[in-house]
């Protein structure tokens, strides 16, 4: 008896509706299924600790599974930051230290094991700042690829300050470039960084060997911190696409290291793409599908996608595709805005102005659900997984007394969040969303 051959062709997926990104190709990102016993989070942590496996594919599978599983079991530990006002930026320095920048222009390091806060001296311009200058604080902290230099804002929020890692000794200040606040910074190589300013320009700064070695020599001769002053290598204005040029402010930057391309978001609702190597050359500008309150941007290298936050949506842009192919997801946080966004494996983490953390699965194209029903905000099992920040600290100032004293709890906007290198710890920080309120929040979710 002959055995009949059976066709196992898969049925084609139905076409997507208008505005849906039907051409997302997930075949390149299909992963082998793990055996049931190896899907355990405990197994992942044990294997990471013992490191018996050298197979990068296997470790990639484990990291992907952990990224999807961890959010539902994270628990919060708050840190007390005193009377600091609104944490705008943060980066992990190592497995136990996170560096942060605030609206009150304070740069500090928090030890996530002890909760100890250490303040870092702010670097000043070569010329004193005008006394009438109002500081907006530190909005950006970025570390170069080799993790040897850290770039952030200076005492003058229009200037870029660079520190050496891991010591946080000062290296240089880039001043005289922008005439308004720096909102974002991106490293495009180990020695070159780009700053995006509220004046609508992007500055290219180079930390040459001469500058770095000079600061080394000066530190050896003096007990007082000394540093160099550098000028921009290039200064480019973003295109004034809108009818209101006042809104042409560079709000966020993200770098694609594979293609050497720099994405920029401006407050007039446009996404700009630049070739970023030894200089900046414009490639394209496109209107965003949702163009209100575009204040955060991230790039997912594995997915070749930019994620842009707006008032109530996260939009995913692939510069290789026509603008109408952009996919946007509604975050159910209308009115408060998306304040921070990041990629980790196939999960996009979203921080909102209402103090919520949401987790979007790019492969499944949906938000993670609460599989346990134990989440603080979940009404029932299967609801969208939402983690809510703690109370933090709030100054009961005149603004609060006049306008917010009848509110039981003022939520803390998630202005910044970042995963550690293992992907098992999530640092989250921010403060009250209303401009006149003074307060802070910082917590470790692990």
Swiss-Prot record:
Residues 1-32 are annotated as: Disordered. GO terms for biological process: protein ubiquitination; regulation of autophagy; ubiquitin-dependent protein catabolic process via the C-end degron rule pathway. InterPro entries: Beta-prop_DCAF12, DCAF12, WD40/YVTN_repeat-like_dom_sf, WD40_repeat_CS, WD40_repeat_dom_sf, WD40_rpt. Keywords: Cytoplasm, Cytoskeleton, Nucleus, Repeat, Ubl conjugation pathway, WD repeat. WD repeats lie at residues 132-173, 177-215, 245-284, 333-370. Coiled coil: none annotated. PROSITE patterns: WD_REPEATS_1, WD_REPEATS_2, WD_REPEATS_REGION. Residues 1-12 have a biased composition (Basic residues). Its main location: cytoplasm. One of its GO terms (molecular function) is ubiquitin-like ligase-substrate adaptor activity. It is found in: Cytoplasm; Cytoplasm, Cytoskeleton, Microtubule organizing center, Centrosome; Nucleus. The keyword Cytoplasm applies. Pfam families: Beta-prop_DCAF12. Pathway: Protein modification; protein ubiquitination. GO terms for cellular component: centrosome; Cul4-RING E3 ubiquitin ligase complex; cytoplasm; nucleus. Component of the DCX(DCAF12) E3 ubiquitin ligase complex, at least composed of cul4 (cul4a or cul4b), ddb1, dcaf12 and rbx1. Substrate-recognition component of a DCX (DDB1-CUL4-X-box) E3 ubiquitin-protein ligase complex of the DesCEND (destruction via C-end degrons) pathway, which recognizes a C-degron located at the extreme C terminus of target proteins, leading to their ubiquitination and degradation. The C-degron recognized by the DesCEND pathway is usually a motif of less than ten residues and can be present in full-length proteins, truncated proteins or proteolytically cleaved forms. Belongs to the WD repeat DCAF12 family. This is DDB1- and CUL4-associated factor 12-A. It comes from Xenopus laevis (African clawed frog). The gene is dcaf12-a.
């Amino acid at each position: 008896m002959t055995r009949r051959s059976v066709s196992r062709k898969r049925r084609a997926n139905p076409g997507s509706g208008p505005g849906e990104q039907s051409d997302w190709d997930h075949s390149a990102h299909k992963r082998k299924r793990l055996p049931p016993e190896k899907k355990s989070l405990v197994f992942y942590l044990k294997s990471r600790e013992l490191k018996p496996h050298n197979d990068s594919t296997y470790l990639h599978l484990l990291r992907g599974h952990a990224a999807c599983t961890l959010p539902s079991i994270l628990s919060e530990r708050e840190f007390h930051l005193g009377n600091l006002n609104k944490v705008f930026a943060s980066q992990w320095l190592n497995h136990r230290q996170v560096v942060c920048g605030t609206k009150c222009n304070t740069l500090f390091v928090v030890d996530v094991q002890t909760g100890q806060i250490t303040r870092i001296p702010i670097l000043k311009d070569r010329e004193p700042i005008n006394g009438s200058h109002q500081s907006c604080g530190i909005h950006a902290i970025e570390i170069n690829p080799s993790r040897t230099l850290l770039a952030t804002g200076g005492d003058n929020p229009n200037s870029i300050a660079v520190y050496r890692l891991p010591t946080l000794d000062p290296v240089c200040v880039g001043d005289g470039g922008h005439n308004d606040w720096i909102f974002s910074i991106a490293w495009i190589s180990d020695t070159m960084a780009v700053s995006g300013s509220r004046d609508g320009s992007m500055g290219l700064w180079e930390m040459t060997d001469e500058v770095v070695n000079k600061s080394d020599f000066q530190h050896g001769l003096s007990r007082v911190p000394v540093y160099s002053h550098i000028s921009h290598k290039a200064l480019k204005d973003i295109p004034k696409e809108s009818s209101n040029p006042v809104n042409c402010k560079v709000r966020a930057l993200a770098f694609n290291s594979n293609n050497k391309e720099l994405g920029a978001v401006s407050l007039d609702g446009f996404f700009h793409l630049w070739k970023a190597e030894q200089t900046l050359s414009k490639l394209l500008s496109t209107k965003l599908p949702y163009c209100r309150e575009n204040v955060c941007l991230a790039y997912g290298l594995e997915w070749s996608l930019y994620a842009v936050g707006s008032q109530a949506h996260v939009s995913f842009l692939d510069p290789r595709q026509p603008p109408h192919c952009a996919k946007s997801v509604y975050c159910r946080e209308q009115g408060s805005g998306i304040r921070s966004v990041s990629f980790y494996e196939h999960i996009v983490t979203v921080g909102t102005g209402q103090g919520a953390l949401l987790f979007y699965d790019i492969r499944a194209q949906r938000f993670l659900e609460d599989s346990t029903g134990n989440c603080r905000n979940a009404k029932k099992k299967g609801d969208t997984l939402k983690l809510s920040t703690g109370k933090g600290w709030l100054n009961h100032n005149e603004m609060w007394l006049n306008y917010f004293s009848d509110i039981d709890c003022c939520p803390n906007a998630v202005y910044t969040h970042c995963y550690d290198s293992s992907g098992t710890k999530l640092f989250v920080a921010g403060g009250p969303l209303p401009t006149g309120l003074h307060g802070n929040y910082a917590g470790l979710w692990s």
